[in-house]
Amino acid sequence: MCPRPGPPLGLWLLLGFACAAHLVGAPPRLCDVLWVLQEERDQCLQELERERLGEEQPVPGCQGLWDNVSCWPSSAPGRMVELECPRFLRMLTNSNGSLFRNCTQDGWTETFPRPDLACGVSMNDSSHERQHAYLLKLKVMYTVGYSSSLVMLLVALGILCAFRRLHCTRNYIHMHLFLSFILRALSNFIKDAVLFSSDDAIHCDAHRVGCKLVMVFFQYCIMANYAWLLVEGLYLHSLLVVSFFSERKCLQGFVVLGWGSPAMFVTSWAVTRHFLEDSGCWDINANAAIWWVIRGPVILSILINFILFINILRILTRKLRTQETRGQDMNHYKRLARSTLLLIPLFGVHYIVFVFSPEGAMEIQLFFELALGSFQGLVVAVLYCFLNGEVQLEVQKKWQQWHLWEPPLCPVALSSSFSNGTSSLNSTKACPSGRSRDTCKVSII
């Protein structure tokens, strides 16, 4: 019986490189490689055993062989056998190559060229070192980005929940968006902890199911985040375009779209993976057709948001050019335009640029998707909460009540409303005395 195979020369260093950073379609973990290696070994030994049992008498030549890397079939003397690189090496290098052995009267010759050279496992390639260093820096950047975003989003979500006067449909949608960014950051940290933890092969089988569940949760959080970005775009577009827009009725539909539709697609993906591609931890998407179950809806949501972005800019430009928009109306539309220009590009429009990107643009794509994308939650929290005039007013009043022991001032807050394509301004006294009005009911941003 052959001994349990260990990773060949160069595999450990390659796995260290693979675990340097989280990537979309990242290199596999050591456990994934060992699972594939064990599957190939078991399959080879079964085929060799069936071949041995089917022979009535020994055949002269070279017997079938498992050399801990490849499965060599029986061969007659004087022949050269060619095999493609084993699957576990192709998982690491994404390159095809061939291995050769000669069958002589004395048996098999050594494999040539060496598997690490034939299959692209070059340990002296300086480009691997540069890429390794780049991925390490990238991992540090997106870890800082997700951490800072997580802190700011938690604070922003707490503020919107704490002040009842800020409770309205618009801010309810913002809360859901903040929560989706929080889940995205947390799922990324959990996934990194599972995928890039100590990969002791003894514990591979014990963590296999849990690792898949983590990947399902991670994919759900990613899709939910894109779904709520789409909801933000649909909501803003509806306020500008639809004459009679019932916000409360649409909120229920938005909740179903934001949390329900990702669950449907991720469940379909998980079931498909289980039956058609149940290999590894489900972090490698070798089957493009299965991966498009998730990738397709995400790209579609990005495309829809981009179309909404263009139409919103068209509407705002038309309103800004009309003669009726003057004074405070003009300032309001400029504020709306600035917020839109800052927010909509953050919806992930840059993904469209990299959908069919060439292989040489991978580093640029990773920088946009991971390094800059990890700060997306921070920017959204600042834009939707900390720079919001209504939020600042409520926090200022509460600060004065708690620390200055003085009655808060009574500033006049200007708000606007849209009705039948026209705009109007309303002034609201923000005093604690008397009946207070909801300061966010008629505001768009």
Curated annotation (Swiss-Prot):
Signal sequence region: 1-21
Cystine pairings recorded for this chain: C44-C71, C62-C103, C85-C119, C211-C281
PANTHER family in the record: PDF RECEPTOR-LIKE PROTEIN-RELATED, SECRETIN RECEPTOR
Membrane topology category: Multi-pass membrane protein
Domain of life where this protein originates: Eukaryota
GO biological process: adenylate cyclase-activating G protein-coupled receptor signaling pathway; cell surface receptor signaling pathway; diet induced thermogenesis; intracellular water homeostasis; regulation of appetite; regulation of synaptic plasticity; response to nutrient levels
Its biological purpose: G protein-coupled receptor activated by secretin (SCT), which is involved in different processes such as regulation of the pH of the duodenal content, food intake and water homeostasis. Ligand binding causes a conformation change that triggers signaling via guanine nucleotide-binding proteins (G proteins) and activates cAMP-dependent pathway. Upon binding to secretin, regulates the pH of the duodenum by (1) inhibiting the secretion of gastric acid from the parietal cells of the stomach and (2) stimulating the production of bicarbonate (NaHCO(3)) from the ductal cells of the pancreas.
Protein name listed in UniProt: Secretin receptor
UniProt keyword list: Cell membrane, Disulfide bond, G-protein coupled receptor, Glycoprotein, Membrane, Phosphoprotein, Receptor, Signal, Transducer, Transmembrane, Transmembrane helix
Main localisation: membrane
Homology family: Belongs to the G-protein coupled receptor 2 family.
Keyword Transmembrane assigned: yes
Species assigned in the record: Oryctolagus cuniculus
TM segment ranges: 138-163, 171-191, 213-235, 251-272, 288-311, 337-352, 364-387
